[in-house]
């Protein structure tokens, strides 16, 4: 694990910094060794998550939404819930970037 990167856990929101999905926002839904399992509910669903090395993502925030709580507790999460949550969080991040 990279000592310069914060510890990324299940239910964290991350942004891809490498690869063709660079700039996309994902939820961390699991781990497989050195890989994170990422889903956004659109092109990367819960049924077919993206496997990506931790060094290729950057932690955006530790989410405290209902979706994050479901991921942590192991409850069923729908792809639509992921999409809505990430759209809401992305709008908030864009507003912060614009000084709003």
Predicted regions and their residues:
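Ferredoxin-like alpha/beta domains used as RNA- or RNAP-binding modules
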Residues: 1-10, 17, 27-100
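Short, charged beta-turn/beta-strand-edge "cap" motif at the junction between a beta-strand
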Residues: 19-22
